[in-house]
């Protein structure tokens, strides 16, 4: 078939046709090489819902708007620190620096970590019990179980209320997940407060296991003593009472961190404190400034906000949406916000990609 066509074509037309094919192939190969030549930007995933959503939003913009590949690496707090120092991790969308104060100070001073600004303007992490434990819930027919419970000291009197089903003689504290720095801090605080003598400390193996343990207790109207944080869908959905601790003190917190790092014995410390309330920031490896300056500038501009991310997380929970679907919902419902982060050409690329994905935009 092809022989017949070429046999009746003038030589000059054959030459031109072949030249066009060669140029097209070379162009595709060059484009492929250019794309392959870009090292992917590595995002850390420390396994909680808000960072999954934030990663999806940022990675979509980077891949579609800046045409730069990205990847996600699941890491523990320790692995994240090592990876950022070595340059194996490029972006940490939720740098909870208050949980890593010593490392954060060293990393920013040495210069391999750049704090590019807040992703959420406020955050809270603390120890909680359901409000119905303290006040009851008339609609659900729940009587107050611990009407005098207010402080960490009071918890010593209520260990039997928060009974560990696997060890009925002791109470149970639901800690953060294994591998988080804050989980170790919580364990140290439990010991300093003297609560380790009354409670077993349970560390769920994943964020989903943590959420399931808490949500199932709330739905059943059962007593529960647990650690959690905001922004999250869970604290947006369930009514809680925060357990009072001594006010945050940077010197006291430094001692807690030294214990976690093995540089100080818990026996040498007799006080602990609440977590600091602050914003959550994005951390970027310094090499990204040269490798992808446009992406670096975008990350400096990107701020989702606490209320918007809470709405995204509520959407994920209510609609059983995955992080990618939640990101599309964010793009559709907070269009003015994300457009403000981007230069015009990148904004147009993102708009085209969202249109192809079926996202309806007003702009």
Feature map (PLM): residue ranges:
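Short, well-ordered beta-strand elements
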Residues: 35-50, 68-73, 170-174, 299
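An extracytoplasmic/periplasmic, membrane-proximal ligand-sensing/linker region
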Residues: 50, 183-197, 208-211, 215-221, ...
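Pocket-flanking alpha-helical
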Residues: 55, 75-112, 213-216, 233-238
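Flexible, solvent-exposed loop/hinge segments that line or gate ligand/substrate-binding clefts
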Residues: 101, 115-117, 192-194, 200-311
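A conserved helix-loop-strand patch within extracytoplasmic ligand-binding domains
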Residues: 113-174
């Amino acid at each position: 078939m092809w022989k017949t066509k070429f046999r009746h074509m003038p030589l000059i037309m054959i030459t031109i046709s072949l030249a066009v094919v060669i140029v097209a192939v070379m162009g595709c190969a060059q484009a492929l090489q250019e794309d392959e030549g870009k090292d992917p930007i590595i995002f850390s995933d420390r396994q909680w819902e808000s960072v999954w959503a934030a990663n999806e939003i940022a990675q979509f913009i980077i891949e579609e708007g800046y045409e730069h590949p990205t990847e996600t690496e699941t890491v523990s707090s320790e692995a994240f620190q090592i990876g950022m120092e070595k340059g194996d991790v490029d972006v940490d969308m939720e740098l909870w620096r208050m949980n890593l104060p010593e490392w954060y100070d060293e990393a920013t001073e040495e210069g391999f970590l750049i704090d590019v600004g807040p992703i959420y303007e406020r955050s809270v992490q603390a120890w909680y019990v359901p409000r119905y434990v303290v006040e009851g819930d008339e609609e659900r027919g729940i009587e107050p179980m611990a009407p005098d419970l207010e402080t960490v000291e009071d918890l010593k009197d209520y260990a039997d209320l928060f009974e560990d089903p696997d060890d009925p003689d002791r109470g149970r504290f639901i800690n953060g997940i294994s591998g988080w720095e804050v989980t170790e801090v919580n364990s140290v605080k439990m010991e300093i407060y003297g609560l380790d003598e009354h409670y077993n400390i349970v560390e769920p193996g994943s964020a989903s296991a943590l959420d399931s343990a808490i949500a199932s207790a709330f739905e059943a109207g059962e007593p529960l003593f647990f650690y959690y944080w905001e922004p999250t869908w869970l604290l947006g959905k369930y009514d809680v009472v925060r357990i009072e601790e001594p006010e945050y003190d940077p010197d006291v917190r430094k001692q807690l961190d030294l214990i976690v790092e093995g540089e100080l014995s818990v026996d040498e410390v007799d006080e602990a404190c609440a977590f600091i309330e602050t914003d959550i920031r994005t951390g970027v490896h310094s090499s990204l400034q040269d490798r992808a300056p446009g992406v670096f500038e975008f990350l400096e501009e990107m701020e989702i906000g606490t209320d918007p991310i809470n709405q995204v997380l509520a959407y994920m929970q209510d609609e059983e949406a995955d992080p990618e679907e939640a990101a599309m919902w964010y793009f559709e419902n907070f269009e003015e916000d994300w457009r403000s982060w981007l230069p015009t050409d990148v904004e147009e690329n993102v708009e085209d990609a969202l249109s192809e994905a079926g996202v309806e935009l007003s702009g």
